[in-house]
């Protein structure tokens, strides 16, 4: 199984996971034209798309994806907020299958109607990817995970130095996004014996530091795990 990030920020998010036979688009938060340019794929080449929540940096071209005839999966709350029809409604803990990939949605914690993360398990190679972005924390443990793609949005010490940041913005960050030490503590609680790579998602332009975050995560996980920051 392969994970790839094409956009990962508050300006837009788009990722893919593929196991050779199935190619799934994770989020569609950039323009349709930009998605095709960055990924190198036309809409028709995606088996399906999953959307975590309704915020535009994760969903702005969902109409184009639906119009292209690609199945789109999201929670009922997300579909209602986006006011879209013709999508596949999924819920926490209810497994579904796309091609050769079994997918399990799980609840996340964000200022959205019904946000979800997703676990992907390939029937082709048995690998497991956990995808969770835009969440203040995670309440679940995932045994047998091969790859983690997870939010690492801000550092509380850097945030504290942003004296001119409006209090409303500061409050939203701390109550809906994952702080780097929270992530590290979560990773320490996991059995990562089967994990080969961790991807850090959605790093803030103003309140994160890519090199610092990578080093902190390396200190929190076993030595065999590779850490990659997806900051474009």
Where are these regions (language model features)?
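Metal-dependent catalytic neighborhoods of phosphoester/phosphodiester hydrolases
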Residues: 60-69, 84-85, 208-216
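Divalent metal-coordination and catalytic microenvironments
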Residues: 17, 27, 53, 72, ...
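Metallo-beta-lactamase
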Residues: 73-126
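Short, hydrophobic beta-strand segments that form beta-sheet elements in well-ordered domains
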Residues: 24-27, 49-51, 69-76, 88-89, ...
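Cap/insert and terminal regions of metallo-dependent hydrolase folds
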Residues: 143-232
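Active-site environment of divalent metal-dependent phosphoester hydrolases
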Residues: 11, 54-59, 80-81, 112-113, ...
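Conserved beta-strand hairpin/beta-sheet module of binuclear metal-dependent hydrolase folds
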Residues: 1-39, 116-134, 147
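Active-site metal-binding motif and surrounding structural segment of the metallo-beta-lactamase
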Residues: 31-77
């Amino acid at each position: 199984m392969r994970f790839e990030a094409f956009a990962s920020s508050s300006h837009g998010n788009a990722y893919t996971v593929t196991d050779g036979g199935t190619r799934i688009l994770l989020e569609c938060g950039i323009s349709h034209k930009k998605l095709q340019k960055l990924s190198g794929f036309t809409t028709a080449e995606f088996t399906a798309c999953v959307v975590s929540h309704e915020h535009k940096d994760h969903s702005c071209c969902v109409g184009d994806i639906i119009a292209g005839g690609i199945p789109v999966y999201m929670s009922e709350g997300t579909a209602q907020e986006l006011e879209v029809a013709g999508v596949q409604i999924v819920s926490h803990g209810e497994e579904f299958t796309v091609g050769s990939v079994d997918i399990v949605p799980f609840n996340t914690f964000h200022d959205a109607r019904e946000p979800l993360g997703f676990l992907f398990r390939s029937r082709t190679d048995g690998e497991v990817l956990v995808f969770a972005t835009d969440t203040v924390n995670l309440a679940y443990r995932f045994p047998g995970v091969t790859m983690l793609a997870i939010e690492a949005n801000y550092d509380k010490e850097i945030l504290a130095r942003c004296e001119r940041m409006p209090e409303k913005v500061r409050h939203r960050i701390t109550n809906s996004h994952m702080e780097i030490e929270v992530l590290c503590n979560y990773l320490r609680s996991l059995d990562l014996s089967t994990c080969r790579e961790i991807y850090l998602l959605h790093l803030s332009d103003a309140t994160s530091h890519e090199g610092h975050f990578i080093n902190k995560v390396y200190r929190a996980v076993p030595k065999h795990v590779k850490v990659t920051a997806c900051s474009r």
